[in-house]
Amino acid sequence: MELFDLSGRVAVITGSSRGIGKAIAERLAEHGARVVISSRKPGPCDEVASAINAKHGEGRAIAVPANIASKEELQRLVDETRAAFGKIDILVCNAATNPYAGPMAGITDEQFGKILQNNVVSNHWLIQMVSPEMLERKDGSIIIVSSIGGLRGNALIGAYNVSKAADMQLARNLAVEWGPSNVRVNCIAPGLVQTDFAKYLWENPELLKQVTDPAPLKRIGQPDEIAGAAVYLASPASSYMTGQTLVVDGGITIAW
């Protein structure tokens, strides 16, 4: 058994038309998996799938656009994946949203509801759609991309952090429930990564210096540096790991 071999495995990655999700999809395909690219907009999904097929061979990737806020669209994502590839071995819940920045007292019910819906409830929906076949097969890896925000307080993105902490607890609970059936559930908690999602932080040189100086590695992360963690959690290399949160943050959470 090769530790990081994903040959014959099928992976669904949400939010995979760009950023961390795209990097994860590319690296899973590189290690042998067939991958499903999914985000809201069809065009970018098609582009990523086409690039993966051009690099690794036709049929290695398909695009199935879906809005994570829609239970019906998530079910279609699962159904079309099974129709194309016959099964789902790996699920990466990466898509998330944050429509509000500011103190908790200022967030509207609609904004808070959207954050919890898209970042927690939608993950729950999709996981429950995919899990029955994994439990029956007694094999599967589910990965939730959380954030170090789920480990810390923050005066500007408190609601987002609440949702990311909930993702970690979701993984822990499901790991306990499904461990006897050899279905593993883990989280990745990235620090600041150079994606469009965090563009407001790294576009400003002064702000970037402010947020990276406390980190031992003194720099921002790249999407591909999160992808390595996903390959590990998806592969046989992590077969004895479940219910955990793998922190990939340049050391910021351990620095004084």
What are these model-predicted stretches?
Residues M1-E2, N98-A101, R152, V231, ...:
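Short C-terminal tail/terminal secondary-structure segment
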Residues V10, S17-G19:
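Conserved glycine-rich cofactor-binding loop
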Residues G102-M104, T108-L116, V211:
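Substrate-binding pocket helix/loop in short-chain dehydrogenase/reductase
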Residues I107, G153-N161, N173:
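Active-site loop-to-helix junction immediately N-terminal to the catalytic Tyr of the SDR YXXXK motif
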Residues I127, S163, A171:
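Active-site helix of classical SDR
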Residues P132, V176-P180, S239:
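Alpha-helical segment proximal to the catalytic Tyr-Lys
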Residues S147:
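Residue(s) in the substrate-gating loop at a strand-loop-helix junction
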